[in-house]
Amino acid sequence: MENILKSKLWSISSFIENKKYSFNKDEILSHLPGEFIDEAIKSISSWEGYSPTPLIDLNKLNNELGFKNIYYKDEDKRFELKSFKALGGAFAVNKIADEKGDITVATATAGNHGRSVAWGAQRLGLKCKIFISEFVSETRAEAMRNLDADVIKVKGNYDASLRECIKQSKKK
Protein backbone atom coordinates (compact mmCIF):
# COMPACT_ATOMS: atom_id res chain seq x y z
CA MET A 1 0.00 0.00 0.00
CA GLU A 2 2.89 2.33 0.77
CA ASN A 3 4.06 2.19 -2.88
CA ILE A 4 0.61 3.16 -4.13
CA LEU A 5 0.42 6.15 -1.79
CA LYS A 6 3.84 7.39 -2.97
CA SER A 7 3.06 6.93 -6.66
CA LYS A 8 2.63 9.91 -8.98
CA LEU A 9 -0.96 8.94 -9.81
CA TRP A 10 -1.98 8.86 -6.17
CA SER A 11 -0.39 12.24 -5.45
CA ILE A 12 -2.83 13.99 -7.77
CA SER A 13 -5.26 15.42 -5.23
CA SER A 14 -8.20 15.36 -7.65
CA PHE A 15 -7.98 11.56 -7.61
CA ILE A 16 -9.56 11.59 -4.16
CA GLU A 17 -10.76 15.14 -3.69
CA ASN A 18 -11.16 17.93 -6.20
CA LYS A 19 -10.28 21.00 -4.15
CA LYS A 20 -11.41 23.33 -6.94
CA TYR A 21 -14.97 22.04 -6.93
CA SER A 22 -17.37 21.29 -4.16
CA PHE A 23 -20.25 18.99 -4.96
CA ASN A 24 -23.62 20.44 -3.98
CA LYS A 25 -26.14 17.62 -4.33
CA ASP A 26 -29.17 19.88 -3.71
CA GLU A 27 -28.11 22.33 -6.41
CA ILE A 28 -27.59 19.58 -8.96
CA LEU A 29 -30.88 17.86 -8.09
CA SER A 30 -32.71 21.21 -8.38
CA HIS A 31 -32.12 21.01 -12.15
CA LEU A 32 -33.92 17.67 -12.32
CA PRO A 33 -37.62 17.85 -11.50
CA GLY A 34 -38.49 15.54 -8.62
CA GLU A 35 -41.35 14.01 -10.56
CA PHE A 36 -38.90 13.02 -13.33
CA ILE A 37 -36.68 11.24 -10.81
CA ASP A 38 -39.71 9.56 -9.26
CA GLU A 39 -40.93 8.50 -12.72
CA ALA A 40 -37.52 7.02 -13.59
CA ILE A 41 -37.34 5.09 -10.32
CA LYS A 42 -40.89 3.76 -10.71
CA SER A 43 -40.38 2.79 -14.35
CA ILE A 44 -36.94 1.20 -14.06
CA SER A 45 -37.74 -0.71 -10.89
CA SER A 46 -40.72 -2.31 -12.68
CA TRP A 47 -38.62 -3.72 -15.54
CA GLU A 48 -38.28 -7.48 -15.65
CA GLY A 49 -34.95 -8.51 -14.19
CA TYR A 50 -34.50 -5.33 -12.16
CA SER A 51 -32.76 -5.49 -8.83
CA PRO A 52 -30.90 -2.77 -6.95
CA THR A 53 -27.17 -2.95 -7.49
CA PRO A 54 -25.27 -3.99 -4.40
CA LEU A 55 -22.94 -1.70 -2.50
CA ILE A 56 -19.82 -3.53 -1.43
CA ASP A 57 -18.09 -2.21 1.67
CA LEU A 58 -14.35 -1.95 1.05
CA ASN A 59 -13.46 -2.13 4.75
CA LYS A 60 -9.85 -3.16 4.28
CA LEU A 61 -9.27 -0.12 2.07
CA ASN A 62 -11.22 2.04 4.57
CA ASN A 63 -8.81 1.03 7.31
CA GLU A 64 -5.66 1.39 5.21
CA LEU A 65 -6.59 4.87 3.98
CA GLY A 66 -8.16 6.06 7.21
CA PHE A 67 -11.61 6.70 5.75
CA LYS A 68 -14.81 5.97 7.61
CA ASN A 69 -16.46 4.20 4.67
CA ILE A 70 -15.68 3.42 1.04
CA TYR A 71 -18.27 1.58 -1.01
CA TYR A 72 -18.12 0.10 -4.46
CA LYS A 73 -21.41 0.11 -6.42
CA ASP A 74 -21.32 -3.15 -8.36
CA GLU A 75 -23.04 -2.60 -11.72
CA ASP A 76 -21.69 -5.86 -13.15
CA LYS A 77 -25.10 -7.53 -13.28
CA ARG A 78 -27.21 -4.54 -14.31
CA PHE A 79 -29.54 -6.20 -16.83
CA GLU A 80 -26.47 -8.12 -18.01
CA LEU A 81 -25.21 -4.92 -19.67
CA LYS A 82 -22.42 -4.54 -17.09
CA SER A 83 -22.46 -0.75 -17.16
CA PHE A 84 -23.62 2.12 -15.01
CA LYS A 85 -24.93 3.63 -18.25
CA ALA A 86 -27.36 0.76 -18.67
CA LEU A 87 -30.31 2.70 -17.32
CA GLY A 88 -30.22 6.14 -18.97
CA GLY A 89 -30.46 5.15 -22.62
CA ALA A 90 -33.01 2.42 -21.97
CA PHE A 91 -35.14 4.77 -19.85
CA ALA A 92 -35.04 7.42 -22.60
CA VAL A 93 -36.21 4.83 -25.14
CA ASN A 94 -38.99 3.78 -22.77
CA LYS A 95 -40.11 7.39 -22.19
CA ILE A 96 -40.08 8.30 -25.89
CA ALA A 97 -41.92 5.10 -26.84
CA ASP A 98 -44.60 5.88 -24.23
CA GLU A 99 -45.15 9.27 -25.92
CA LYS A 100 -44.63 8.37 -29.60
CA GLY A 101 -45.57 4.71 -29.90
CA ASP A 102 -44.01 2.45 -32.52
CA ILE A 103 -40.83 4.26 -33.55
CA THR A 104 -37.28 3.59 -34.68
CA VAL A 105 -34.74 4.86 -32.17
CA ALA A 106 -31.26 6.00 -33.16
CA THR A 107 -28.14 7.16 -31.38
CA ALA A 108 -24.45 7.70 -31.89
CA THR A 109 -22.13 6.00 -29.45
CA ALA A 110 -18.74 4.55 -28.75
CA GLY A 111 -20.19 1.63 -26.80
CA ASN A 112 -22.09 1.44 -23.52
CA HIS A 113 -24.75 4.06 -24.27
CA GLY A 114 -25.53 2.31 -27.55
CA ARG A 115 -25.90 -1.02 -25.78
CA SER A 116 -28.36 0.58 -23.36
CA VAL A 117 -30.43 2.12 -26.16
CA ALA A 118 -30.36 -1.14 -28.15
CA TRP A 119 -31.39 -3.13 -25.08
CA GLY A 120 -34.23 -0.69 -24.37
CA ALA A 121 -35.44 -0.91 -27.97
CA GLN A 122 -35.22 -4.72 -27.99
CA ARG A 123 -37.13 -4.86 -24.71
CA LEU A 124 -39.98 -2.86 -26.27
CA GLY A 125 -39.85 -4.49 -29.72
CA LEU A 126 -38.70 -1.30 -31.45
CA LYS A 127 -36.30 -0.91 -34.36
CA CYS A 128 -32.94 0.55 -33.42
CA LYS A 129 -30.10 2.13 -35.40
CA ILE A 130 -26.76 2.68 -33.72
CA PHE A 131 -24.16 4.87 -35.44
CA ILE A 132 -20.55 4.20 -34.49
CA SER A 133 -17.24 5.56 -35.72
CA GLU A 134 -14.76 3.45 -37.61
CA PHE A 135 -12.66 3.37 -34.44
CA VAL A 136 -15.21 1.46 -32.35
CA SER A 137 -14.16 -2.16 -31.89
CA GLU A 138 -15.97 -4.98 -33.63
CA THR A 139 -16.58 -6.52 -30.20
CA ARG A 140 -18.61 -3.47 -29.16
CA ALA A 141 -20.46 -3.38 -32.48
CA GLU A 142 -21.30 -7.08 -32.15
CA ALA A 143 -22.62 -6.56 -28.61
CA MET A 144 -25.13 -4.04 -30.01
CA ARG A 145 -26.02 -6.30 -32.95
CA ASN A 146 -26.71 -9.07 -30.45
CA LEU A 147 -29.42 -6.77 -29.07
CA ASP A 148 -31.02 -6.61 -32.55
CA ALA A 149 -29.65 -3.15 -33.37
CA ASP A 150 -28.76 -2.14 -36.91
CA VAL A 151 -25.17 -0.95 -36.37
CA ILE A 152 -23.92 1.57 -38.94
CA LYS A 153 -20.16 2.18 -39.00
CA VAL A 154 -19.27 5.72 -40.12
CA LYS A 155 -15.91 6.85 -41.46
CA GLY A 156 -14.35 9.28 -39.02
CA ASN A 157 -14.62 9.83 -35.29
CA TYR A 158 -17.55 10.00 -32.85
CA ASP A 159 -18.55 13.47 -34.10
CA ALA A 160 -18.88 12.07 -37.64
CA SER A 161 -21.10 9.26 -36.37
CA LEU A 162 -23.25 11.80 -34.50
CA ARG A 163 -23.64 13.96 -37.61
CA GLU A 164 -24.64 10.90 -39.67
CA CYS A 165 -27.13 9.84 -36.99
CA ILE A 166 -28.76 13.28 -37.05
CA LYS A 167 -28.79 13.35 -40.87
CA GLN A 168 -30.36 9.87 -41.17
CA SER A 169 -32.85 10.58 -38.38
CA LYS A 170 -34.25 13.56 -40.28
CA LYS A 171 -35.10 11.38 -43.29
CA LYS A 172 -38.61 9.99 -43.50
Model-predicted regions and their roles:
Residues 1-172:
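PLP-dependent amino-acid enzyme catalytic core
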